[in-house]
């Protein structure tokens, strides 16, 4: 499976990475392993569809993680 990070989440991490899939892997577990606080997440997409941290990932999935975006 693949994990893509966007904007500030890339700082000190990566842009795109192949992730070793394991049975029962969730979006929330990947957030934990990357030390990304769920409160800082704006959008989570799996295969271009909105998802939640408890979503169980599949072997060929692509997870995209976007931070909250502020401005004004």
Features from the language model and the residues they span:
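Ubiquitin-like/PB1-type beta-grasp interaction modules and other compact soluble beta-rich domains
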Residues: 1-71
């Amino acid at each position: 499976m693949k994990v893509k990070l966007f904007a500030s989440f890339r700082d000190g991490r990566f842009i795109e990475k192949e992730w070793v899939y394991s049975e029962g892997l969730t979006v929330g577990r990947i957030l934990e392993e990357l030390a990304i606080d769920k409160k800082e997440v704006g959008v989570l997409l799996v295969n271009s569809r909105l998802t939640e941290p408890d979503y169980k990932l599949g072997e060929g999935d692509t997870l995209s993680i976007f931070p909250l975006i502020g401005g004004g």
